[in-house]
Amino acid sequence: MRTGLITAALTLIPAAAFAHTGAGEAHGFVSGFAHPLGGLDHILAMVTVGIFAWQLGGRALWLVPGSFVLAMAIGAALGMAGVALPFVEFGIAASVIVLGGIVAFACNAPIVVAMGVVALFAIFHGHAHGSEMPIDAAGGTYAAGFMLATALLHAAGLALGCAIGRTTEGRAGYRLGGGLVALAGLAILANTV
């Protein structure tokens, strides 16, 4: 009963209010935070980075996601500066395909290789974030927003990787999940062509 009342009350909130996040510093942070969460391609890639890091274990748990966030910041700076980067949408779609495949096949790459792979893809994701920054958003807080959202998506991937790995069918779960992510990446790629 109580859940039903809360749900009914929430439906009365005008959705248009969520389309306007404000102006200035707060606007920048909220817009930046929302950007990675607004695209399935970003969500799939970033959560899958966390799962990949979990599969590798050890220092990869923080080095792999950390290299993604750092490289994404570099890509965003390029995008904010108006530096053209070819094939951004293709690179983002490829990241979903490749990362899904890496998880599905449980690729046991050296940490430095894993960091390089995710960093390469992160440049494309970052460029998309940076080049799509709202004109009235503050750059620093916008970047802080999408970097925090990305780190949280990585953390969700780490938690999901842990949860899948603890099941008796963990290996099959990684294969199925990674395969579905790769298939979604193919659909995203087909949509960008």
Identify the residue ranges that each predicted region occupies.
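Membrane metalloprotein/metal-transporter helix-bundle signature
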Residues: 2-193
